[in-house]
Design a protein with these regions (language model features):
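Positively charged n-region of N-terminal signal peptides that target proteins for export
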Residues: 1-10
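C-terminal motif of bacterial Sec signal peptides marking the signal peptidase cleavage site
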Residues: 15-19
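Non-catalytic cap/lid and distal C-terminal segments of serine-dependent acyl enzymes
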Residues: 24-330
Length: 330
């Protein structure tokens, strides 16, 4: 009931932005397939996931649970144990330290849990097929959580936890994962993790999308690729305090101050045309696209035709974005 009320209030508040939404939709050309960040159009529609990609692949990757030591960054800083689930591709050999893998961290939305991306029907199979068919290089995929206890803490508690998550990511999750699995990081020191940023991505859905924008704000020096799915930047306030321009101002200033245009970064922003809270993403996209700094080799905005605020849409966003991040031709 609480979620329904919040979504309803969002819709009422953002009706006035309909003109902006229509403006973006008019700009969108036809989908253009799996291309690199240098080739992809800045706006478009996502392509459907082939049904065959949702079936079991002959060569299947593995998913395993990883418990790691962290801290309660929301409350008292006490030592806690958190959980993530890690996908390794077919052929991954724990004893082969010479072969390196790109990595993407994925974050759930409100009420979600670690491992959620592997639970949804067909998504793990899709990862297998993307790799087997050469759409992407073999990669490591981490389905993490911003919840300390891996369970819902209500909307307010969720906001507190995802706002603090970047501390867990930098100090605990990333070192735990990349100290165990063979990524491009030579070690888990901040220096080596930052040096391997071109081989690292972060994405999330709904409140996980908001988390992704905050990861850009806090951890741009650790991550090159970002996939915010159905959500805007809340650096300033809950729902960004409906201050999209102010939040984009912050991002623009960050890019300038940190020379990120030269260092490289790429944001694949996505939402469904029937998503109940799409107005946040559309307003964010409209503001980003209005700035000359955010060219198509740094920011794109794609929509799923008929897509709702659900994991079916998320599956399609991943299918379209991963080849742009980690395509086999890169």
């Amino acid at each position: 009931m609480q979620k329904t009320l919040i979504i309803f209030l969002l819709l009422i508040t953002m009706i006035s932005c309909a003109a902006c939404q229509k403006q973006i939709q008019k700009q969108i050309p036809e989908a253009n397939g799996s291309m690199s960040a240098e080739e992809i159009s800045q706006t478009g529609f996502t392509e459907l996931v082939p049904e065959s990609y949702k079936t079991e692949a002959p060569r299947q990757g593995k998913v395993e649970r990883l418990d790691y030591e962290s801290q309660d960054y929301v409350r008292d800083g006490s030592v806690i144990t958190k959980t993530a689930y890690v996908y390794t591709p077919y052929g991954y050999d724990e004893g082969d330290a010479e072969t390196k893998y790109d990595i993407i961290y994925l974050m759930h939305g409100w009420g979600g849990h670690a491992g959620e991306y592997f639970d949804y029907t067909g998504t793990k199979n899709m990862f297998d097929h993307l790799i087997e068919n050469g759409d992407i290089e073999p990669i490591i995929i981490v389905s993490a959580t911003f919840y300390n206890e891996n369970s819902d803490t209500g909307f307010g508690g969720s906001v507190d936890e995802f706002r603090a998550f970047h501390n867990d990511f930098e100090n605990c999750l990333m070192p735990a994962v990349e100290g165990k699995y063979h990524t491009y990081a030579k070690s888990t020191t901040p220096e080596d993790l930052k040096a391997s940023r071109d081989h690292r991505a972060f994405g999330g859905f709904s409140l996980g999308s908001v988390t992704t924008w905050l990861e850009f704000c806090h951890d741009y020096d650790y991550i090159h690729y970002f996939l915010p799915m159905s959500g805007s930047c809340w650096y300033y306030g809950t729902y960004g305090d409906f201050q999209i321009e102010k939040n984009v101002d912050f991002i623009e200033q960050l890019v300038k101050e940190q020379d990120l245009t030269a260092k490289g970064y790429f944001i694949y922003h996505a939402v469904g045309t029937n998503d109940a809270v799409k107005s946040q993403s559309l307003d964010m996209a409209d503001e980003m696209l209005s700035r000359d700094m955010f060219t198509s080799d740094h920011y794109v905005f794609y929509q799923k035709e008929g897509g709702y605020h659900d994991l079916d849409a998320v599956q399609e966003y991943l299918y379209n974005a991963l080849p742009v991040f980690f395509g086999s031709e890169k």
